[in-house]
Amino acid sequence: MSQLLDKETLKKMIRENVKTLYRKTLEAASAEEVYQAAVFAVRDVITDKWMKTHDEYYEKDVKVVYYLSMEFLMGRFFGNSLINLEMYDEVKEVLEELGIDYNMVEDAEPDPGLGNGGLGRLAACFLDSLSTLQLPAYGCGIRYHYGIFEQKIENGYQVEAPDNWLENGDPWGIKRNEYAVEVKFGGNVRAVPKGNGEYRFVQENYQSVIAVPYDYPVIGYGNNTVNTLRLWEARAKNKLDLKFFNEGNYQKAAEEELLASTMTDVLYPADEHIQGKELRLRQQYFFISATVQRVVERFKKHHTNFHELPDKVAFQLNDTHPTVAVAELMRVLVDENDVPWDDAWEITRKVCAYTNHTIMAEALEKWPMELFSRLLPRIYQIVEEINRRYCLELQAKYGMDHEKLRRMAIIADGQIRIPDKAIAE
């Protein structure tokens, strides 16, 4: 077994955890309760490696890959973690010596509702590989409350129910309130003169939510590296409006909390209607803005020259959903850190990389200009400027071929074409 955890110590920890968590003896505990107790025991070993890994990254100021994805189909953490820690056989023996069927304990873990199919599984495999290869990396996404759905068959027909994978708690995720950031939506943008004909752009009259990260360990196989899957959860800036509550308008009083909760409830909400489209765009910008803001703040602890950012940070955009990261990084550099546009664009192009997974038309996202500009007004301005400069490059290369320019432009026919935006960068 691990040099940090012998069999007798593990047995004692599982018994003590059952008692502390559930006020029960081990013999009276359910499989789900034993599972939770075993996770907290094993997590001691994981956390030691996890802390050492990130202390080393910080001290050496290494370059870190941030893999941005709407989904991560990780599968159950328990068994995979034990295999990568090379503790699987020993933990199984310990549970059997305690009179517990290991398979029942493993089956008690809910499958995290964080992914759907190939895109999410690819993201999970990349994270596993990066840890096993001992390459510094974060996965960054959303901590969905319900994922896609739980499938039931009734009278031969599929019935969809919420997949409440967090119902009995989450022993793997560690809430990091100290890294929470504000994400802004809507409002208007005001240009404030800075002098010399330059302006600073300020977003006003906006709605905002607080993005709170939860960190999950991604363990390398047979080594001491533990990277991080960071999933963001939305929280209302003001959970309860006491004025409305005291007036008896309880629904209005909790409106802000409901809006925030909805943002991280479900992976891929139905988008046949405008409300669904808006929710999807909110989700995408929410986790991207939170990630970019946090990464830049982390970079600034070591550095003052933003031209060094590409030497320390790489954003890998997994399909079209995270591509708003291009404009968001520009916003953070230009608006919040006074980096000149041309310098910021050079930095952004070096930091961001994009992988497209399909050429099916339905998978190549487009956003109505009205929705995009209303929900993300400053990001829309930045995309407009990127598009203007990109079209000038196209004109210089292809001349005034209006049909070619229309087909290749980022903004055309009342739509913002997301793949074109990613490729243009």
Q: Predicted segment positions?
A:
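A conserved ligand/cofactor-binding region detector
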Residues: M1-E425
